[in-house]
Amino acid sequence: MNKFLTAAPVVAAIWFTATAGILIEWNRFFPDLLFHPM
């Protein structure tokens, strides 16, 4: 459990960075699809 507590912030930071990067790249290539109404 102690190893999980030390690894959790690192995994969360990498996950949020990857998600933000994917959203930025998607918005750069497809700017109209991100804000298109469903």
Curated annotation (Swiss-Prot):
Cell compartments where the protein resides: Cellular thylakoid membrane
GO CC, any one term: plasma membrane-derived thylakoid membrane
Membrane topology: Single-pass membrane protein
GO biological process: photosynthesis
Transmembrane segments: 4-24
Coiled-coil ranges (or none): none
Pfam families per UniProt: PSI_PsaJ
Keywords: Membrane, Photosynthesis, Photosystem I, Thylakoid, Transmembrane, Transmembrane helix
Main location group: membrane
NCBIfam families: PRK02733.1 (NF002743)
Role this protein plays: May help in the organization of the PsaE and PsaF subunits.
Family: Belongs to the PsaJ family.
Name under which the protein is recorded: Photosystem I reaction center subunit IX
Gene that produces this protein: psaJ
